[in-house]
Amino acid sequence: MAFTKKTVRDADVEGKRVLMRVDFNVPLKDGVVTDDTRVRAAIPTIQYLKEHNAKIILMSHLGRPDGTGFQPELSLRPAAEKLAELTGFDVKFVEDTYGEKAKEAVDALQPGDILVLENVRFDKREKKNDPEIAKTLASYGDIFVLDAFGTAHRAQGSVVGPAAYLPAYAGFLLEKEVDTLTSIFADPERPFVAIVGGSKVSSKIGVLDHLIDSADTLIIGGGMAYTFFMAKGYTVGTSLKEEDWVERAGEMLKKAEAKGVKILLPVDNVVADHFGEDAKGEVVDSDKIPDDRMGMDIGPKTRELYAEAIKGAKTVFWNGPMGVFEMDQFAAGTEAVCRAVADSDCTSIIGGGDSVAAVNKFGLADKMSWISTGGGASMELVEGKALPGVEALLDA
């Protein structure tokens, strides 16, 4: 399915002020960027604009500020420094977003210059999509480019606002993300195996529903598996469960059966008596979880079962871990699935969020076909929802 919006290639950017929303929401430790994936992802569009002598104004959020003003630990300065380090470009930074200092910094730009504005969320009006915010941001540019796929599902001031006042185009990352994620579901090479993990059925109900309509096999892991176990009549001890969603999980199992879609649930689990770094794991079958134990990971038989299903796939979509992979003693299930996907001769799409963290943790990022930079945005696209940020752009 071809991308239906105009991209930066369609714009005349020569000498123009290009206001670009990027996703520099990167993890920081002691003021240093610990994972630069999102900064790297924005570079192709930035490079293109620089080569075409645009005056480039970059804006992003970082973290969850309280919206009452400057918070030094959530400043975008480290992201601006990382961009300079990765590209070798001179990157200017201004400790202001909507005020006089920002306006002066924009006015001083020459063709080819790059300026990063301070965190857009230091003002609470950003999240409310306040028109005043949008108007201020739009006043900095002649053209608006959206390349922040990770926030394209949010109707917020810096994401959709400028498009009301400026001609709005997609950046290369946004185009590639939407193209990749929509085409895989429109016409996947089969067998198509979807792997969904994570803690809650409730947060991924739309995705699961959509996958039952398009996948040949649906593999379920993580905390959500225990709600499905309850639908099958198993007891799950003190495992994470959503009792309000048991009936819905049961309906999904029936729907999959009626459609001839194979749903794979864990046959064994690694359980522990409490949730903590010092917790010790033991393996039990899925229908024999003791009352005082909680599921923390899929067990060894399940790891083999899932790896076998993945091995035969031509297309794999993966979103969500198989267990508490942040703790090494409960990481084996997620690692096994990750390695099976990496070793498989398939088109592999990693759907953002914790799956990306897992792929990076196990050093397998270069073995995947496409790693999405969006968690929530990927999921909404997979569900078939329109993304407000994309909708606001000019039609091709």
Describe every region a protein language model picked out:
Residues 1-396:
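Active-site loop-to-helix "anion-binding N-cap" substructures in soluble metabolic enzymes
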